[in-house]
Amino acid sequence: MKYRRILLKLSGEALMGERPYGIDPEVLQSIASEVASVVRAGVQVAIVVGGGNIWRGRKEAAAQGMDQASADYVGMLATVINALTLQDAIERAGIPTRVQTAIAMQEVAEPYIRRRAIRHLEKGRVVIFGAGSGNPFFTTDTTAALRAAEIDAEVIFKATKVDGVYDADPKTHPQARRYDVLSYQDVLTRDLRVMDSTAIALCKENQLPIVVFDLTTPGNIYRVVQGEPIGTWIGQTTPKSNGIPARLAQESGS
């Protein structure tokens, strides 16, 4: 395998499948099976999961006139629901798993402790981080960047419903162009919104590459962790620099 330790960012929406709300059991089982195969290949896997399949903090706050901080706390609890569900699915796939939350809830999960999380990873356990960063006004993408830096992950894999980063929404713009390679600065200056600016800044500061890929294609989690050039690679360097993966550089025409 190309990587030793990774962080997988799953949006809550990714768990819905084609449902309008909640969790699709088939999608959950598929994700768990692929994560299990990656762990069996010797890769240490941490996961940050969102909660948008249950609660959309900013959207709900705006619609109901709810205080933003309160709405964000509800969203954090939604991520814990997803984390516990994902834990059960991965353990049924035969892989030991721990959930750590940024908000203490000792009856259902461990508190987030960096050194303990790293020790779990070293023992071959999947660690799922719930409750975001524990602070309102921060997204789960920012949490993913923060936790990846803290546990010394080599890369963040952001699983989405599209096969990379585009210059426009491919669902509404059929002529939208997909990028194979981007620098952090490209993402910020072009306002591509693959992650919020705080998350991108954290990744840039810690030189954490991001790979955005399509979760809906079976086997893609294993392929992308193996190093296959699928999706969009985002990093410190531009396509003409020496730091990007060679195959991606070839694809981008460098």
From Swiss-Prot:
Record's keyword terms, sorted: ATP-binding, Cytoplasm, Kinase, Nucleotide-binding, Pyrimidine biosynthesis, Transferase
Q: Looking at its record, which EC class is this enzyme?
A: transferase
Q: Where does the source fall among the domains of life?
A: Bacteria
Q: What is its main location?
A: cytoplasm
Q: Where in the cell is it found?
A: Cytoplasm
User: What is the residue range of the signal peptide feature?
Assistant: none
Extract one GO molecular function annotation from the record. Answer: ATP binding
Q: Does Manganese show up as a keyword for this record? A: no
- NCBIfam families in UniProt: pyrH_bact (TIGR02075)
Family statement drawn from the similarity comment of this UniProt entry: Belongs to the UMP kinase family.
* Designated name of the protein: Uridylate kinase
Organism equals Synechococcus sp. (strain JA-3-3Ab)
